[in-house]
Amino acid sequence: MIIGSGFAGLSAASFMAKAGWNVTVLEKHDTPGGRARQFKADGFVFDMGPSWYWMPDVFERYFSQFGKKVSDYYQLKRLDPSYRVYWKNEFIDIPANYHALRDLFEQIEPGSAKKLDRFLEEAKYKYQVGLNNLVFKPGQSLLEFCDWDLVKGLFRLDVFNSIRAHVQKYFKDQRLRQLMEFPVLFLGAMPEKTPALYSLMNYADIMGGTWYPEGGMYSVVEGMYQLALELGVEFRFSQNVTGVEVRSEAVSTVKTEKGEIFPADVVIGGADYHFIEQDLLPGPFQSYTSNYWNKRDMAPSCLLYFVGLNKKLSGILHHSLFFDVPFEQHAREIYSSPQWPTDPLFYVSAPSVSDPHVAPASHENLFFLVPVAAGLTNDSHEIRKKYFELIVERFEARIGQPVRDAVIFWKSFAQSDFVEQYNSFKGNAYGLANTLKQTAILKPSCRSRKLKNLFYTGQLTVPGPGVPPSLISGEVVAKQVMKHFG
């Protein structure tokens, strides 16, 4: 029995079915995908969650384990430029071609091209060790890490240094530093608190490339869902899990809001870990206290806007990052002194630049994302409207084109929606921050400490936040189930 059909739940379901288990997935919503759902309105097609497709090798590896290829389920195109970064008075397009990127770095900071070579050589080593070894550890014991290749490479992995300090060793120009720190924002912590190990994300960005699955990120969900069906997985949609029954130190049944009761030999929780622990389990069977959860460093939540325009915008790219205000203040308002941001950085995805099927002809599909602290209150319509006007005004100023008058559709999604729709702890969007003290065995365990047949997968356990890690998380937990239950 698997609770939730997000990326991790879909992954776990397929691995369990491949091993010969009868698998049932209970999903709260009426479609698969969890936070990666899709909605359609007025001819626009919006991805509700992830919008970046990085680490294509992880997706290819996933499907290959079932004798399939990514191209059996969806088609990819590499974006070039990969993305654009706006500062106050300029912007830079990040080319997909590495030689062009070296030239760009050299123009900005003489001598930095060779430094970029050295930086990425280190990042490549971390990526290879991380993707071939570290991320597949279930985090159940320190003994998992008594691996000679890991031990001898410990200092090369740079786990005790911060990514900020690591980047500053190589580059002096503030724009280059921001470019190299940007990928770790996906990991949910400030650069000075994120281990330099995660420069592997720079390798993923630059050498792996930025891709787009035709039809949007939901095409990946549909592909994984189709694979699971082919393997015999049963899906029960609109089944909101409300409780479990425990017998003999094991979950015996899972109950849903409709009053249905599902017997279970093994349960894998792919929904929010905190929700399952604190809301579904009786107190004596919770592995962690509420105090434990309240002390976790959470990745940010998001203020999201899905926007449809009745015209095309000239010269914009699929992905754009807006670093046109100081990062430090926004970072403090997310991590140090949680509050609604004064003047936030933001990100815009315009999938209609790459895909004519996500918007009506001569229209534009825009997705705005503003990172905000997890756990904020007063998520009101007035707050959402205020930030929408602020962000659109800055967007207009940076791209030099009017936008507001062309808006014919907009919908917001924020803290309270993450809680209501996904039972998200503190309304987080990405899970736990990837700090050193929340890495590997220091994350919430992928196996319950109190119930022998309850396991967890997804962004609040190993290996961490992000779509590729979620695919891996499903594989890791499935192998743990097989290890203990055959």
Language-model segments: which ranges?
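C-terminal segments that line or cap access tunnels to active or ligand-binding sites in enzymes
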Residues: 310-419
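Mid-domain catalytic core of redox enzymes
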Residues: 242-360
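A glycine-rich dinucleotide-binding beta-alpha-beta segment and adjacent secondary-structure elements
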Residues: 173-187, 343-347, 401-463
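Rossmann-like flavin
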Residues: 88-194
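Helical element adjacent to the flavin cofactor pocket in flavoenzyme catalytic cores
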Residues: 200-251
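A conserved FAD-binding loop/helix module that cradles the flavin
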Residues: 50, 459-482
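N-terminal glycine-rich phosphate/pyrophosphate-binding loop and immediately adjacent elements
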Residues: 1-128
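Short beta-strand to alpha-helix junction loop
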Residues: 154-163, 206-226, 379-387
